Amino acid sequence: MKVTKLAVTILSSAIALSSFTAPLSAAPLSAENKQFLSAYEQVHQALAADDLAAAQKVAADLGPAGSELAKSKSLPEARDAFSHLSDTAKKITTDQPGYYVVHCPMLKKDWVQTSETITNPYSGSKMLHCGEIEKK
């Protein structure tokens, strides 16, 4: 009976430890994905600061992926375009350490950021800290 309990304890410990190491086994990001995520984070920060011009400038550097946002004529239009970039960012960062998927329940929008301090790119200064980290 003691051997069975010991085996169960060891097995349970091994399973628990493997859940902590799983994210570390994610494939490294490609140079292209790193560049995209760097620009994405800059656009995120610009929109959170209500800075349309800065968001457009960085989005233009993203090429075709950022063209819709780069051509936007207003913050609401830019924020709509940002949601497409967020979909891409969520896919790229799956299982990557250091990236957080955040959800704004009021606007029903998601984005990726590198800090646990929430800065909402969809609401800017109106609701800058509205959001919940859904995935680390």
Positions of predicted regions on the chain:
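Bacterial N-terminal signal peptides that target proteins for export
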Residues: 1-14
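Intrinsically disordered, low-complexity terminal tails/loops enriched in metal-binding residues
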Residues: 12, 16-136
